[in-house]
Amino acid sequence: SDLSDGFNRYKDPARFASSEVVELNEYSSIWYGKLEERDSYFLLSPQSYLQCADEFITNASKYGLDGVSFRDFGYQLAADYNDKRHVSRSKAIDIQNDTFKSSKDNKLCFMINAGNEYALENVDFITNMTLHGNRYAILDNLVPFYQIALHGYKNYAGTAVNLGYENDQVILEAAESGAGLYFVFMKESEKILQETYYTEYYSACFDDWKDRFVSMYKEYDNKMMPVMNSTISNHEYLNNQVSCTSYDNGYKVFVNFGYVDYTTESGVLVPARDYIVMVEE
């Protein structure tokens, strides 16, 4: 692109109340210090990302795409204290919501990452939703309250199955909370990412995953189809490792996170590390 069309580090970023440009750094999750070897990055001003989003949505419609997604929309929210274009956090929310509505006006679905409450009304799909809490050892059990409120109204998924810490665990958590399955793939071999800062995609090569992906997705889709558009009416733990999620259409999803088979009081067998969907009489 022309020089005037690219990113301008003095014009496009948001500014702190001190008028300094918002330039951020990555920090270690282990020792909490700044990672000097990583490049810094800028936080775009709401006005700048609005212009980019409008242009992208227009072109997406032109090329006949089904939907769009921006990494930070609905997830990251910041004000801009630039004296010449001050934008408050509430105004930034309005700007993002206007963008969501613009995508609908252009017959485009909108997908967001993780997501905040203000974005829920106008988006179609949420990825990387936290399905199983923060895993603090002090917690006994977890209740998928957020998913209970949203299921049947919005589509959502947890972490990418192929990038998760344990594929089976990710699927079990999805079944418990009524989430969809989410995968992240790339065409090239993950070997090209060795000795880079993108090693989290260690298991993203589509050719390596194709058969497993198809099998996992078909099985999950067939099992969960009866409750896909239903609302959740109840969630309970039958023991420390087995949960039961009930839906308004009479179906129940039993999930066994343990390594021993479990039989319910009514005689339903829930195999270890598996889930079943059924109408319990």
Identify the role of each PLM range:
Residues 2-281:
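Active-site-proximal substrate-binding groove within the catalytic cores of carbohydrate-active enzymes
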